[in-house]
Amino acid sequence: MPRIISRSPKMPQSRYTAGVPADGKISPGVIRVIVKTPGNQIIFTVADDTLVRQFKEILSAHFKCQMEQLVLVFMGRLLKDHDTLSQRGITDGHIIHVVIKSKHGPRSLAHSFRNLVTNNPCHQDRNPKGNSSMVCQSAGMNETKVESSLLMEPEAPKVGTESPEVGSLEHIAQVLENLCVQSLLSNMDFVHQMPPEQPYMEELIQQNPEVSHLLDNSEILCQTLELVRHLAIIQEIMQIQQPAQNPEYPPNSQPFLGLETVPNGNNHLGQSYVNNNDHMLNGVPDLLEGNCFTALLDEQVLEQVQTPSLSQPLPQEQWDQLSSSQVIYANSCGLSSITPTNATPNHTNNVSRENPAIVATQGQSNVCAVQQPAEIPVLPTISINQKPQVDKDTTITLGISDQWLEEDLQQSDDQTSSQITGGMIQLLRNHPQMAAQMLLLMNTSQLNEQWRQETPTPLQSSQLHDLLLALANPKTSQALLQIEHGLQLLATEAPALLPYIEPYLWGLGWLIPSICSYPDIVPWTWNVQDMAEPQCPESCHKSETVLQKVQPPSGDPSHSLQAPEVRFSKEMECLQAMGFVNYNANLQALIATDGDTNAAIYKLKSSQGF
């Protein structure tokens, strides 16, 4: 395929106006349209409701050509004659590209080659060797100039073109319209001989195999060469496909080219879906880290998801990298068994150990490890036998994140839930120390005393079952944090109301004895002498810290009764010195953050939009 390369000095763009008043003032309803040609650009003043056909008449009179030769392009779309400029969104200052066709109209190279026999404007070089390629020579153009303009090497731009006329767009159009050149390019034998002779063409075919199909198809080749004659349309198409690299045109808010027209567009779209699903899966364990009650399950349940044929254990390096506080909630669909590999508790060994459990599915296998204290036993074996709800040919894999999440969130089985809950209740009944530690986290003395006196009873098991189901919900922790925040504001704004809500404060560590009169507010303290020190993961300590924020300092009982202005006077001065002049906003931020200056600054910046 011949490669046409031309270089010419950049022509200065002449920009003059046509039909603009001398004073420069434009009446309403009149717009200025910039008409851009390959050589220059002109400003026309027309009415905004002008038809495209009427605008073509103005352009044809200016360029001295026929209306059928004009092609108007705006934002990558051809303007039709029956449309108006305002309907196509053309307003004052917009640019319209104009392409002027040749007078004889677009003709294919094959049609031009047929006329070559009758017109015979060139002679053929008949060599005795029987070479099938025909080299034509027209009047005023020798063979050397044709070859230099059509078969120029890639190094030619470094040297430059000798004559500015050769590099002009009009000259390129004339060369392509010449019958000798068209007959030369329509010769498929000549086209097939070009790649072996040109090294850069071979490299281009190796990098882009579609080029070889282009060389084999004569119709596509003719259409491509016909398109090369109109370089303005090619530039417009390239500007649409690369709007970020074109400073002249603003980004189009309504692109007309879909993602499927861009090379590898569907691949990028699919990769974005995969990344979104991965982020969604990675964010599921983060929702459970702040709940101290679900951490009880973290220390006992360790699930290893694998296929029935998987027998090779993971290396030690992969076990070390896995999270120690993560719970995998698997649905009953596709499960065959949940079997701990080490169900015998070891009460003598106090060293923390890893207890892997197996959850066999029909799909991809993943393994995770959870650090478990030695004195807390594992859950008993739970056998789940259920027919899968999908076909036999369907494979359920954790890699297909959207199917796994949909099945996990929407198709929970009552039988499996009851079996797991029953096993957990049985475990807590057999080990009251662990249940007491859980109640210890709740900071509740009444239930703690009731547990010591009535363990185990059927009533206690029923209450514990409901309690576990309620506390295992992540939204429960969020509700408790909201209650804690509201009580904190109430303690600072209206402490006189605290005795009236005494029955509702036991869950958050506020126990106001009935024998004490206001304002003697005494926070309840831990009282577990015969209990072992609780061992909970980091999320439990975070929840304890949050619950303890609501308690006033024990050294100064009247500290919570001070006015917020007096209590946070130093912090208020610090915020005002830093440039936060809104007194009420600073006070509310300090009340919400319990006097934490850094958190108050972050809250104020967030409210201001920074």
Curated annotation (Swiss-Prot):
Residues 562-607 form the UBA domain. It comes from Mus musculus (Mouse). PANTHER family: UBIQUILIN (PTHR10677), UBIQUILIN-LIKE PROTEIN (PTHR10677:SF9). Residues 31-105 form the Ubiquitin-like domain. Signal peptide: none annotated. This is Ubiquilin-like protein. SUPFAM superfamilies: UBA-like, Ubiquitin-like. Transmembrane segments: none annotated. It comes from the Eukaryota. Pfam families: ubiquitin, UBQLN1.
